[in-house]
């Protein structure tokens, strides 16, 4: 199925393996303590498997970006990883210099080291062609002391940076278990989708939703798109519904005016497939009031209405495949979390193959205790959106090209 190598294709016993992961995590700015270790747990399967195969594992990762308060070293990450893996993960305060290379050379079978934050290196934040990235100091220096490269960082796969796209041009390379699982799942809902397929798109990132809609409606993978959040407001406005000045101001303040025109084009072309709310919940002086869309007063819309929830829940029950991204409303406030929670409960109780993406929706599912009833919660963020939008992901493309080159000589 895969056009790239997976971990099944190589024997790592006794070999030095460089593993790129994405363990970028929320950090307490005062204590430096990691507040959520979810991403580290997601990569644990790949790392444990390599240790069990007696590989010598060097981890390459980033934390935040230059200028941010949480742009820190990887020292705390090594401690958390040690606890998760139940074995020492040695922090090396170097990326590709003498200390890093010597640490890699001196590893014993089953050892794991975590190199310094790769974004401390200036060239790492530059997005360039893989051939250029393959000649950076980072890639050339580390390639000289390792035998294999594994990319498990699906969440960063949309970035053409040295640590993500350079190594497959220098080393035998494969996708890690998390990368493999993410790609397999997303292919299933785009290429091998079981119908009917329902997309539930909410939240505030209108550009993401518009890009996804353009692709999935054009390729026919989606049967229905259920809109909520600011996404719904844009489509209501595009449909000629008077959402009132306060709600229009929010759209204009966020520079979403251009998306209203895009939404109108999509609605005109695929109208029957794009569902918008029939009622909404407004915040009137701190109180939830449900109103029909043809009678919205000048108060901010904070959620979809109860009638809309019923209609959307029925579409979810009929679906064989479901993808959801973004909350239905201001779910942080209990009285306006009804839309988000009811739709998530409908997804969890359905027999469909279900995928959710986005940190807010994943957090809501976790808080509700239904994460285990969702088939897949994507770690991808921007990479997931790019994939569903039909974009090529540079880190995956170079893995595929590496396999093509290798297969020629077999």
Swiss-Prot record:
GO terms for biological process: gluconeogenesis; glycolytic process. Its EC number is 2.7.2.3. InterPro entries: Phosphoglycerate_kinase, Phosphoglycerate_kinase_CS, Phosphoglycerate_kinase_N, Phosphoglycerate_kinase_sf. ATP binds at residues 332, 358-361. Its main location: cytoplasm. SUPFAM superfamilies: Phosphoglycerate kinase (SSF53748). Keywords: ATP-binding, Cytoplasm, Glycolysis, Kinase, Nucleotide-binding, Transferase. It is an enzyme of class 2 (transferase). This is Phosphoglycerate kinase. It comes from Methanothermus fervidus (strain ATCC 43054 / DSM 2088 / JCM 10308 / V24 S).
């Amino acid at each position: 199925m895969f056009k790239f190598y997976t971990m099944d294709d190589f024997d790592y016993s006794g070999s030095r393996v460089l593993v790129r992961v994405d363990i970028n995590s929320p950090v307490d700015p005062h204590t430096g303590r990691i507040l959520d270790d979810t991403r580290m747990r997601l990569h644990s399967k790949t790392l444990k498997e390599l240790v069990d195969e007696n590989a010598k594992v060097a981890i390459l990762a980033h934390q935040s970006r230059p200028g941010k308060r949480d742009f820190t070293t990887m020292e705390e990450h090594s401690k958390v990883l040690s606890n998760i893996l139940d074995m020492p993960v040695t922090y090396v305060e170097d990326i590709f210099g003498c200390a890093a290379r010597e640490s890699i050379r001196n590893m014993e079978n089953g050892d794991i080291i975590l190199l310094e934050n790769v974004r401390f290196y200036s060239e790492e934040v530059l997005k360039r062609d893989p051939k250029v990235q393959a000649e950076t100091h980072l890639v050339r220096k580390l390639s000289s002391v390792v035998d294999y490269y594994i990319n498990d960082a699906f969440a960063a796969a949309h970035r053409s940076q040295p640590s993500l796209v350079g190594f497959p041009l220098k080393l035998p390379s494969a996708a890690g278990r998390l990368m493999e699982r993410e790609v397999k799942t997303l292919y299933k809902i785009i290429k091998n989708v079981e119908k009917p397929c329902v997309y539930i798109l909410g939240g505030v990132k209108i550009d993401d939703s518009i890009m996804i809609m353009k692709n999935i409606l054009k390729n026919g993978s989606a049967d229905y798109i259920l809109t909520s959040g600011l996404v719904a407001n844009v489509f209501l406005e595009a449909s000629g519904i008077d959402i009132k000045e306060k709600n229009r101001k929010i759209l204009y303040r966020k520079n979403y005016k251009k998306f209203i025109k895009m939404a109108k084009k999509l609605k005109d072309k695929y109208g029957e497939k794009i569902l918008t709310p029939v009622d909404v919940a407004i915040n009137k002086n701190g109180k939830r009031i449900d109103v029909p869309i043809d009678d919205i007063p000048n108060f901010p819309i904070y959620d979809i209405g109860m009638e809309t929830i019923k209609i959307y829940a029925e579409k979810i029950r009929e679906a064989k495949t479901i993808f959801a991204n973004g909350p239905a409303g201001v779910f942080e406030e209990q009285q306006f979390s009804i839309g988000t929670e009811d739709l998530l409960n409908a997804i969890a109780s359905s027999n469909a193959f279900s995928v959710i993406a986005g940190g807010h929706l994943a957090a809501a599912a976790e808080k509700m205790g239904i994460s285990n009833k969702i088939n897949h919660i994507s770690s991808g963020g921007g990479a997931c959106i790019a994939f569903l939008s039909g974009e090529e992901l540079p880190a995956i493309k170079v893995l595929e090209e590496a396999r093509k080159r290798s297969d020629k000589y077999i």
